[in-house]
Amino acid sequence: VTKKFTIFVGIQILFLPATTQIFMNSLGAIYLDSAIRRLLTYKTLGDKTFAQLEEQDFHYTPNDESNSISVIIRHLHGNMLSRWTNFLTEDGEKTDRNRDAEFTPPPLGKEALIALWEEGWSCLLATLRSLKEYDLLKTVTIRHEPLIVIDAINRQLAHYPHHVGQIVYIGKMIRNEKWQSLSIPKGASAEINQKMKELHTKDPQ
């Protein structure tokens, strides 16, 4: 008699022979894909903000205690290169990183700042795309603190949108009534909800 075991997939319960080879995405692969997709949405928010800004806007600071978009980009660039270069084999806080200098950088133009933005994101995404499911339970260190890989990823999943949100908010302050919304515009919730319902409840052809 062929033994059977149960696999839970979402809300479905599959009863499969123990000898059956199961070809489906593992939880680890699903997690990595989800992390990459979420990070790409954060990058897109930044990209769409930059597209609305002039050169001088990157250096605007709301007050003395706030950072400009230029400074935030420099900080994210330094963080991403430090955290994701040789991610599995070296401490995430590299000895050649000067974090304090990221907050008092020499001025750069819009094109140079966006180049740093792209370099940081490219390093991050290339590393995540190279990871395999079995890497997720390995241990890495950040400032000598041991973390399993999945926790190290989650740490940055919280850190980066924090700063992207700052970029978007400063962009909205600068553009004011000329700001082009990056999410659901005010007063458009019902319309968007209806469109999403139609999109996701279409009858299969």
Whereabouts are the PLM-identified features?
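Polybasic, lysine-rich low-complexity intrinsically disordered segments
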Residues: K3-K4, I13, I22
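Short, contiguous alpha-helical
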Residues: F23, I36-L40, T44-D47, D57-D100, ...
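Short, charged, low-complexity loops and linkers
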Residues: F23-I36, T104-P105, A112
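Hydrophobic alpha-helical core bundles mediating ligand binding, dimerization, or RNAP-core interactions
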Residues: L39, K43, F50, W117, ...
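Acidic/histidine-rich alpha-helical segments that form the ligand environment
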Residues: P105-V140, I148-H162, Q166, P204-Q205
